[in-house]
Amino acid sequence: MEVASDRFRFILDRPIVTEPGAKWTYCGGAPALLARLIAKGTGETLPAYCRKVLFDPLGLGPSEWSVGADGEPRAASGLRLRPRGLVKLGQLVLASGSWNGHSIAPADWIKRVTTPVIAISYGRSYGYHWHMGGRAAAAFSLAGRHRLGRTISADLSRA
């Protein structure tokens, strides 16, 4: 995908190999397509839009979003935040999308993204681009899976 002349055409041309929802296989193409939809719908790049509606309101501080050779942000794996920024994202989810008395994300959306959609492995589940723990909707994690993976985990039963 990263070396294709048109990453979006490359993604859309991939064959569907199983019944949707029957088997989980991670694919960075879905976040790439979502990033393109956000950019087209808002008229802003994914990094600029996220900065405006999420990062600045939360006071996340510096961020970096790596881009491919085509200039498109690597939506699946290219975001870099400081640890305190990651903690704030976890706190936002624990607070059902509210931050300092302001709604940053709708509470019903937070509930949907922390609800498992499909079992993956080792008692874990996945849904809406989020990895979750073995107990249904009792935990979520923001997981970095690169060489030095980072994970923020929150036990929602303690919220």
Residue ranges and their predicted role:
Residues 30-37, 77-99, 151-159:
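Active-site-proximal alpha-helical segments within enzyme catalytic domains
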Residues 1-77:
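Catalytic-site signature segments of enzymes, centered on catalytic residues
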Residues 62-64, 107, 111-158:
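Active-site Gly/Thr loop motif
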Residues 56, 88-91, 111, 115:
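Generic alpha-helical structural context detector
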Residues 65-76, 96-119:
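A beta-strand-loop signature enriched in Asp, Gly, Thr, and Trp
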Residues 70-81, 131-138:
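Carbohydrate-binding/catalytic loop surfaces
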